């Protein structure tokens, strides 16, 4: 199997895993921390907004089965790409959305997708999700991995209570909520 990586942030990483897990070609989705300057940060350190890291997921995929463009299609249906100050009721640096590109192809695809969404006018405000070069990814603690499976009731309550589920449904229907 050929493999590539997509590293994406869209607020709380608990809500960024499930939408990707059932798609063909996606081999794994790992919650973690990306983009900062601290080595091997903990959840508590990242939450202080002093590590430079954001909560993110790193997706391992087979490019012979799915494309980075398909992953971006899913990604943009999981969060509010018009808000760069956090996501829903999670505010601050560690919850900012970011696309971390691994190569020139990913950068171009991300720029094109942003432009396309802005031209389509799906959102009332412009899509402003930053596109940055990938520099690091540190897996989060085990209790954060596959949170939606380990804690389904809390996951559902969090999604609903944060406003994420309502936002996604209002823009995209039930497909990723």
From Swiss-Prot:
Active site: 12
SUPFAM superfamilies: Peptide methionine sulfoxide reductase
Keyword annotations: Oxidoreductase
GO MF entries: L-methionine:thioredoxin-disulfide S-oxidoreductase activity; peptide-methionine (S)-S-oxide reductase activity
Domain of life: Bacteria
One GO term of the biological process aspect: protein modification process
Catalytic reaction list: L-methionyl-[protein] + [thioredoxin]-disulfide + H2O = L-methionyl-(S)-S-oxide-[protein] + [thioredoxin]-dithiol; [thioredoxin]-disulfide + L-methionine + H2O = L-methionine (S)-S-oxide + [thioredoxin]-dithiol
EC number, UniProt record: 1.8.4.11
InterPro entries: Met_Sox_Rdtase_MsrA_dom, Met_Sox_Rdtase_MsrA_sf
NCBIfam families attached to this UniProt entry: msrA
Family affiliation: Belongs to the MsrA Met sulfoxide reductase family.
Biological function: Has an important function as a repair enzyme for proteins that have been inactivated by oxidation. Catalyzes the reversible oxidation-reduction of methionine sulfoxide in proteins to methionine.
Protein name according to UniProt: Peptide methionine sulfoxide reductase MsrA 2
Lineage: Bacteria, Bacillati, Bacillota, Bacilli, Bacillales
């Amino acid at each position: 199997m050929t493999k590539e990586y997509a590293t994406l942030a869209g607020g709380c990483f608990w809500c960024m895993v499930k939408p990707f897990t059932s798609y063909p070609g996606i081999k794994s989705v790992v919650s973690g921390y990306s983009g900062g300057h601290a080595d091997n940060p903990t959840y508590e350190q990242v939450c202080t907004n002093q590590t430079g890291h954001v909560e993110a997921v790193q997706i391992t995929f087979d490019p012979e089965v799915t494309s980075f463009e398909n992953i971006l299609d899913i990604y943009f249906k999981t969060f509010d790409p018009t808000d760069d100050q956090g996501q829903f009721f999670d505010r601050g640096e560690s919850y900012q959305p970011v696309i971390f590109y691994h190569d020139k192809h990913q950068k171009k695809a991300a720029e094109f997708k942003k432009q396309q969404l802005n031209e389509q006018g799906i959102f009332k405000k412009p899509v402003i999700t930053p596109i940055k070069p990938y520099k690091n990814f540190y897996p989060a603690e085990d209790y954060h991995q596959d949170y939606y499976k380990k804690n389904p009731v809390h996951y559902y309550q969090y999604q609903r209570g944060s406003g994420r589920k309502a936002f996604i449904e209002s823009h995209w229907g039930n497909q990723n909520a």
